[in-house]
Swiss-Prot record:
Keywords: 2Fe-2S, Amino-acid biosynthesis, Branched-chain amino acid biosynthesis, Iron, Iron-sulfur, Lyase, Magnesium, Metal-binding. The modification N6-carboxylysine is found at K124. NCBIfam families: ilvD, PRK12448.1. The keyword Iron-sulfur applies. Gene3D superfamilies: IlvD/EDD C-terminal domain-like. One of its GO terms (molecular function) is magnesium ion binding. Binds 1 [2Fe-2S] cluster per subunit. This cluster acts as a Lewis acid cofactor. This is Dihydroxy-acid dehydratase. It comes from Haemophilus influenzae (strain PittEE). Mg(2+) binds at D81, D123, K124, E491. Its EC number is 4.2.1.9.
Length: 612
């Protein structure tokens, strides 16, 4: 029978000093022997997705105490990718993921905690905590802060729905008036919560449901809705139950590595492909799989992308649907239900509810279960009132969206496309693969041949786009922006937004060893691996080269001979794989990250071989 980890610091004569310190935190005599559960919060006033989390930790903690556990809260950092976007701050975003994973490990192991409730929300916080959960392998439940309500404003006598990406695109268009930009800016992000579309934050919170590590509704229930409170309370109660099952009944099925199996990672990736989620999820799932000891690779993602259809098109891929609409359509359980009916998920994986995924779908899929309370839960909707307060409204749609022909979530027969919303491309430009979010690409340019225009940094690319250097038919190549080359693998939302604002969104392609915001759409191909700084062929492209992109055949190639490619490689080997004429301040912390970082096909995790 597993022994409570916390017994190391709470039991025995030699731990009198540790117990004295525990007592100073408020523990009583009868608390020693109970599971100590870490409430891993990520509250910060810097991030709208986390600004409302200050009291959530104590909400969960109180429920843990009622259920018979001892709750101890601590905080992690949280970077807002939108605020860090477009300047040197973006270099710190991806490295913060690994810092979060390490800090959770440090706190939990230093204090011998028995279990965790992870209160996450935005882009790198959920992945960082997920990596830590897999690394630590103690009972863990995720509960996120929830998505923001979609912005709404009236322009030209028409009510439109929008988000922060709309604000970025409009602001870059010189033909748009200051008054219109101001109206959009003030309306784009109306409430607390993670940005309202299927960007990276919401994608990752949805994937925790598919992995089985969070409760149904976690990815889609609005941050502002009163019903979300029950998710926090239930997480507090359920984590104590998981502790009992593991520490008292030796039930290893409740552990993260038993839940996050290869099949569970396939379920998560299938969901991501079906909903056209952020391409960043590929990076984070690969990283989490490595922490879990699961051999999940780019080739597996490629295989899934060829058979899983795109069942939903959500902002930024359309302005018709946002996360509030996904919830109304049954949330992630609704999407997984459609994948199940198509025979595309594994139903025998475990979940934190202590049941199989199949059993969970029987209970929470609105198509197969007509329970009135379940449908009421998924009718929770937006209030349209600006607020930074959680649980501040109780508005509901009149009905759920169960239209699987033309609704927010489709069935396989009426899929938006029979191939999924993400694709992996291979070729001489990306021997280890690269990622494109096909859900955001107009099918007219799924096959694209263009002329390369090369930039050694995102800053140079932005200047080139805004300065008119980029023309119709160009493939914009931005290199030395990978995990090692950046360092930090910053997002390229500004270049893609500016291409759209210049009317080039369907007339150009963009290829980078960096990554893209979850808000990106268009023919934007990222994660080119190996990256330029690791000797990848993207570092050998020259202005004027012809690049062929073929999404249907999953290919991307530089149209030069093997002999010419080898000659260029030999020349670059002598010069060194570094950006030419780039001026960038790189801190010691970022240099450390870059030194250990692997390319994107490995999840940009640390290269453990360097420690041998």
């Amino acid at each position: 029978m597993p022994k409570l980890r916390s017994a190391t610091s709470t039991q025995g004569r030699n731990m009198a000093g540790a117990r004295a310190l525990w007592r100073a935190t408020g523990m009583k005599e009868n608390d020693f022997g109970k599971p100590i559960i870490a409430v891993v919060n990520s509250f910060t006033q810097f991030v709208p997705g986390h600004v409302h989390l200050k009291d959530m930790g104590q909400l969960v903690a109180a429920e843990i105490e009622k259920a018979g556990g001892v709750a101890k809260e601590f905080n992690t950092i949280a970077v807002d990718d939108g605020i860090a976007m477009g300047h040197g701050g973006m270099l710190y975003s991806l490295p913060s993921r690994d810092l979060i994973a390490d800090s959770v490990e440090y706190m939990v192991n230093a204090h011998c905690a028995d279990a965790m409730v992870c209160i996450s929300n935005c882009d790198k916080i959920t992945p960082g905590m997920l990596m830590a959960a897999m690394r630590l392998n103690i009972p863990t439940i995720f509960v996120s802060g929830g998505p923001m309500e979609a912005g709404k404003t009236k322009l030209s006598d028409q009510l439109i729905r929008l988000d922060l990406v709309d604000a970025m695109i409009e602001a870059a268009d010189p033909n748009v008036s200051d008054e219109r930009i101001d109206a959009i800016e003030r309306s784009a992000c109306p409430t607390c919560g993670s940005c309202s579309g299927m960007f990276t934050a919401n994608s990752m919170n949805c994937l925790t449901e598919a992995l089985g590590l969070s409760l149904p509704g976690n990815g889609s229930m609005l941050a502002t809705h009163a019903d979300r409170k029950e998710l926090f309370l239930k997480a507090g109660r359920q984590i104590v139950e998981l502790c009992k099952r593991y520490y008292e009944q030796d039930d290893v099925s409740v552990l993260p590595r038993s839940i996050g199996t290869f099949k569970a990672f396939e379920n998560a990736m299938s969901l991501d492909i079906a909903m056209g989620g952020s391409s960043n999820t590929v990076l984070h799932l690969l990283a989490a799989a490595q922490e879990a000891g699961v051999d999940f690779k780019m080739e597996d993602i490629d295989r899934l992308s060829r058979k899983v259809p795109c069942l939903s098109k959500i902002a930024p891929n359309t302005n018709k649907y946002h996360m509030e609409d996904v919830h109304r359509a049954g949330g992630i359980m609704g999407l997984l239900g459609e994948l199940d009916r198509a025979g595309l998920i594994h139903k025998n994986t475990h979940t934190v509810l202590g049941m199989s995924m199949g059993e969970q779908l029987d209970q929470y899929d609105i198509i197969r279960n007509q329970d009135e309370e379940l449908h009421k839960f998924f009718r929770a909707g937006p209030a349209g009132i600006r607020t930074t307060q959680a649980f501040s409204q109780d508005c509901r749609w009149d009905s759920v969206d169960n239209d699987r022909v033309n609704g927010c979530i489709r069935n396989k027969e009426n899929a938006i496309s029979q191939e999924g919303g993400l694709a992996v491309l291979f070729g001489n430009l990306a021997e280890d693969g690269c990622i494109v979010k096909t859900a955001g690409v107009d099918e007219s340019i799924w096959k694209f041949t263009g002329t390369a225009i090369v930039f050694e940094s995102q800053e140079d690319a932005v200047a080139g786009i805004l300065g008119g250097k980029v023309k119709e038919g160009h493939v914009v190549v931005i290199r030395y922006e990978g995990p090692k080359g950046g360092p930090g693998m910053q997002e390229m939302l500004y270049p893609t937004s500016y291409l759209k604002s210049m009317g080039l969104g369907k007339k150009c392609a963009l290829l980078t060893d960096g990554r893209f915001s979850g808000g990106t759409s268009g023919l934007s191909i990222g994660h080119a691996s190996p990256e330029a700084a690791s000797g990848g062929a993207i570092g050998l492209v020259r202005d004027g080269d012809i690049i062929n992109i073929d999404i249907p055949n999953r290919a991307i190639n530089l149209e030069i001979s093997n002999e010419e490619l080898a000659a260029r490689r030999s020349g670059q080997d002598q010069k060194g794989w570094q950006p030419a004429h780039r001026e960038r301040e790189v801190s010691f912390a970022l240099k450390v990250f870059g030194h250990f970082a692997t390319s994107a096909d490995k999840g940009a995790v640390r290269d453990k071989t360097l420690l041998k």
